[in-house]
Amino acid sequence: MTIRNQRFSLLKQPIYSTLNQHLIDYPTPSNLSYWWGFGSLAGICLVIQIVTGVFLAMHYTPHVDLAFNSVEHIMRDVEGGWLLRYMHANGASMFFIVVYLHIFRGLYYASYSSPREFVWCLGVVIFLLMIVTAFIGYVLPWGQMSFWGATVITSLASAIPVVGDTIVTWLWGGFSVDNATLNRFFSLHYLLPFILVGASLLHLAALHQYGSNNPLGVHSEMDKIAFYPYFYVKDLVGWVAFAIFFSIWIFFAPNVLGHPDNYIPANPMSTPPHIVPEWYFLPIYAILRSIPDKAGGVAAIALVFISLLALPFFKEMYVRSSSFRPIYQGIFWLLLADCLLLGWIGCQPVEAPFVTIGQISSFFFFLFFAITPILGRVGRGIPKYYTDETHRTGSVS
């Protein structure tokens, strides 16, 4: 090939060399398990949500008198509209399932520890953006649960001292949830997924700066292989399993993860007997309800994300992986059970004994993050191949 041809070869362009560096030749620890495949699955979910959302937006009308009917129009009159809507609605649930598994894998293997603090913090920001995007998207069908969910959740901002009421009025675009609110939420719901794409790319770039963690939690530059083709083939197994799982919900149980009240048009004069958010918000909603005071509940929700953000900045551990930390391993499984219990409590009425159970579960949730720094230096089974320098500094990288 001549010098001129080399200069104009597409594969020689910077963008392709960057893609090759991050997606093809990226050096990956050879012992990664299937638990490391949820990052790529999250990317697939995000693409599905954006593509289906763009097509749904072509037929949706963001007006309080037309929104509910436009959704029914998509379901009944648009060719393939039912498939688009069910893919989008259930795709949100799949997205959160994948991301929750991704987060718990990070907690189990301490993927948040040095030198990947920035990777973890970006992940928490992405998680927060997902919650905001999903919430405002849930309002758009303008059913009963959409309307009253928007009313209850947005009114929580009034608990902020001094500026709370002003923020609520700004969110509503008036003095109640109405047409201005719906228009604002539709605009933001269209915009935020693209911000999520940018945040995800930053997350990926930050990860590749120091490389992926591994099940042993031991850093090594020697035992690595190229991402392609080995981990593409490995991830392909997860992609196929995910496609089957996703298809079951779309074609056999498309409304199970939703709420039947949302098939009733929004009525400001009739309050549902029990207002509950989507299932993936239930653990956080249970923590919110466990505090009787509104301001205290909002502070507890803020503390959830502060705890996640602060996790990487606790003192370093001798060993990352829970495989060598049996005490932490047991506490981790208790945390997982606690989060499932919070999810169940979140959909129960606000009455005894559910309130008490929610308060105990919320206390243990925060206790986990409080004792994690201590557990980082407690345990047995430190691998013998750790060097003396590792033991002195507490660093595994």
UniProtKB/Swiss-Prot annotation:
Q: Which UniProt keywords apply?
A: Electron transport, Heme, Iron, Membrane, Metal-binding, Mitochondrion, Mitochondrion inner membrane, Respiratory chain, Transmembrane, Transmembrane helix, Transport, Ubiquinone
Q: Please name the SUPFAM superfamilies in this protein's record.
A: a domain/subunit of cytochrome bc1 complex (Ubiquinol-cytochrome c reductase), Transmembrane di-heme cytochromes
Q: What is its main location?
A: mitochondrion
The record, for InterPro entries, names: Cyt_b/b6_C (IPR005798), Cyt_b/b6_C_sf (IPR036150), Cyt_b/b6_N (IPR005797), Cytb/b6-like_sf (IPR027387), Cytochrome_b (IPR030689), Cytochrome_b_C_euk/bac (IPR048260), Cytochrome_b_N_euk/bac (IPR048259), Di-haem_cyt_TM (IPR016174)
Cell compartment(s), UniProt: Mitochondrion inner membrane
Gene Ontology terms for molecular function: metal ion binding; ubiquinol-cytochrome-c reductase activity
- Name the domain of life: Eukaryota
Q: Which residues bind heme b b566?
A: 102, 203
Is Hydrolase one of the keywords? no
Residue numbers binding a ubiquinone: 208
Task: List, separated by semicolons, the cofactors it needs.
Answer: heme b
Q: What's the further remark here?
A: Heme 1 (or BL or b562) is low-potential and absorbs at about 562 nm, and heme 2 (or BH or b566) is high-potential and absorbs at about 566 nm.
Oligomeric and partner information: The main subunits of complex b-c1 are: cytochrome b, cytochrome c1 and the Rieske protein.
PANTHER family, per the entry: CYTOCHROME B (PTHR19271:SF16)
| Known role | Component of the ubiquinol-cytochrome c reductase complex (complex III or cytochrome b-c1 complex) that is part of the mitochondrial respiratory chain. The b-c1 complex mediates electron transfer from ubiquinol to cytochrome c. Contributes to the generation of a proton gradient across the mitochondrial membrane that is then used for ATP synthesis.
Query: What name appears for this protein in its UniProt entry?
Result: Cytochrome b
Name its species: Oryza sativa subsp. japonica
